Amino acid sequence: MTDSLEYNDINAEVRGVLCSGRLKMTEQNIIFKNTKTGKVEQISAEDIDLINSQKFVGTWGLRVFTKGGVLHRFTGFRDSEHEKLGKFIKAAYSQEMVEKEMCVKGWNWGTARFMGSVLSFDKESKTIFEVPLSHVSQCVTGKNEVTLEFHQNDDAPVGLLEMRFHIPAVESAEEDPVDKFHQNVMSKASVISASGESIAIFREIQILTPRGRYDIKIFSTFFQLHGKTFDYKIPMDSVLRLFMLPHKDSRQMFFVLSLDPPIKQGQTRYHYLVLLFAPDEETTIELPFSEAELRDKYEGKLEKEISGPVYEVMGKVMKVLIGRKITGPGNFIGHSGTAAVGCSFKAAAGYLYPLERGFIYIHKPPLHIRFEEISSVNFARSGGSTRSFDFEVTLKNGTVHIFSSIEKEEYAKLFDYITQKKLHVSNMGKDKSGYKDVDFGDSDNENEPDAYLARLKAEAREKEEDDDDGDSDEESTDEDFKPNENESDVAEEYDSNVESDSDDDSDASGGGGDSDGAKKKKEKKSEKKEKKEKKHKEKERTKKPSKKKKDSGKPKRATTAFMLWLNDTRESIKRENPGIKVTEIAKKGGEMWKELKDKSKWEDAAAKDKQRYHDEMRNYKPEAGGDSDNEKGGKSSKKRKTEPSPSKKANTSGSGFKSKEYISDDDSTSSDDEKDNEPAKKKSKPPSDGDAKKKKAKSESEPEESEEDSNASDEDEEDEASD
């Protein structure tokens, strides 16, 4: 016989819900550990009174009845385990595993039998159903009725609220059967009543969740939170764990109680009670027990009078009454010298405490993570430029908890702690293959041809060439633009009306005023607009003839291996993919080229073609009017078009400058120069009739030039098509 049996996927019944966990059976005890809450229940071998097997839906299970009258039910065993389990129970606990027969006739009348803390409703010798009395929260009697109310489990999708029993009156009975039924139920029911004297009372205790100040009254089986608005009664057996944690500034203490089931405030459930204490607050309480009761009932763990800081006194009383040890922060010490690591969880800031067997976060919302729940941890966003990092915890059920904004100084301490606890870190360099299976993961491979990328590069080169041509035009037209030479700082500072003076002086009639100045301003604005439009048109015209003329004698460029292969397989691609678009052939060919393993034939041919190109280029001499000459000639012609005339340069050598709109013919230039030499005048005269005629002639000649350019470009396109 084996010393123990262990099952990893067994369900235990907890208030109408089957909770999964691990069951271990040894000669000394039966241990069940809840997977979700981590709560451990132990049944000593000496306390076992009866063990039966029972059929459940789709499986079978065990009924373990203790001498104290408590019933435990475990389900999820395979049929093949029945014989093996029966032999182990007989050898370890000296019990015969007899099957419990159930009545399935559907009758709703029978006999109520009380066995320990279980109400069994039987018909003849078979059980119809069983009610654990520890699940009963209230029992109310009527004339011939008894109503049982039950504690609710939030994890249960459907719960039993109440059950009514009709008990017929018996005249010959000495006792009323209704009262007797009520007494049997109440003797074993988990009814919370605040009758009797409390063991200890703590006044005005600050609680962070649920927020408020409450008076805490501690009784033997439960404790009560009494606030201004809400009142809670919490059974001692619903407390899973106790935590005593110091605040980061060491001026406060957190006392945390983990609850299952949680308390409810409206629709909000609180799985943790977070109490906040000041370390310097002290109290003294006297327990209402004699020395003999303290020694017999609590094994001498409590004294008659307890004094000290409030959190220590409450923690000591809770620890003994609940029967759970208090968990501290452990050996971890952070950069701040305390066990707390400042961080943010979800939308609120709080503190993360690395414990000996898990993590706990306080306080909004509180969260406890056990090591056995953790799949991996990750240090995220911890680059050199950032001053903080994120700590991600991934659970085995797929849930990810992210603690963000942790100071960079905590990284080394936290990493050493993770290494010491042997937790799996997911970003150590081995797991950086996140994009391996993505289709676009190898798109940056320069050895593979990409038709779309080549087209984009060609367009970018053409655009750069056009931009260079445009920039040279703009630079050449703006060579004479010297605004600082046209203004007089002294005149602007000391003249009362600089613009009106200059306008009056330049007016031939000599009758300038406010209205005349406004008109001239409008004329100048319109002239500036015309100038901008003209520049824009000139830029468009200069871009058109930028096309290069091909040199027919220039050697043909070398063809790549991909293009050689594509030219040979183009027809086969069309046959295999009927109806394929011309634009899709290159894309399909690129995919086939990537899958092609043996490319040596095409690569050798491409190498020969490349050598041929280099040899021909060595002996090649450009023809007159070829690419290089055309290119230079095109740019020089553009510069000649926009090059300023000598008369303009002579005009700009004075105290001010003149733009194109104000340049007149030779007759008016001398008069303008004389006027420019006068120190009080800063702006030139409006354009004369001669200027207008000159502009008209120039504008008529420009369309002719553009037509010639367009004809030349059309001829180039025809040459390219013929090639």
UniProtKB/Swiss-Prot annotation:
It is found in: Nucleus; Chromosome; Nucleus, Nucleolus. Residues 586-621, 677-692 have a biased composition (Basic and acidic residues). Expressed at highest levels in nurse cells of the ovary. Gene3D superfamilies: 2.30.29.150, High mobility group box domain (1.10.30.10), Pleckstrin-homology domain (PH domain)/Phosphotyrosine-binding domain (PTB) (2.30.29.30), Structure-specific recognition protein (SSRP1) (2.30.29.220). Residues 644-656 have a biased composition (Polar residues). The modification Phosphoserine is found at residues 443, 628, 664, 668, 670-671. SUPFAM superfamilies: HMG-box, PH domain-like. It comes from the Eukaryota. SMART domains: HMG (SM00398), Rtt106 (SM01287). Keywords: Chromosome, DNA damage, DNA repair, DNA replication, DNA-binding, Nucleus, Phosphoprotein, RNA-binding, Transcription, Transcription regulation. Its main location: nucleus. GO terms for cellular component: cytosol; FACT complex; nucleolus; nucleus. PROSITE patterns: HMG_BOX_2. GO terms for biological process: DNA repair; DNA replication; follicle cell of egg chamber development; negative regulation of protein phosphorylation; positive regulation of actin filament polymerization; regulation of chromatin organization. Residues 555-621 bind DNA. Pfam families: HMG_box, PH1_SSRP1-like, POB3_N, Rttp106-like_middle, SSrecog. Residues 459-564, 586-723 are annotated as: Disordered. Signal peptide: none annotated. Component of the FACT complex, a stable heterodimer of dre4/spt16 and Ssrp. Interacts with CHD1 and TRL/GAGA. Belongs to the SSRP1 family. Component of the FACT complex, a general chromatin factor that acts to reorganize nucleosomes. The FACT complex is involved in multiple processes that require DNA as a template such as mRNA elongation, DNA replication and DNA repair. During transcription elongation the FACT complex acts as a histone chaperone that both destabilizes and restores nucleosomal structure. This is FACT complex subunit Ssrp1. The lineage of its organism: Eukaryota, Metazoa, Ecdysozoa, Arthropoda, Hexapoda.
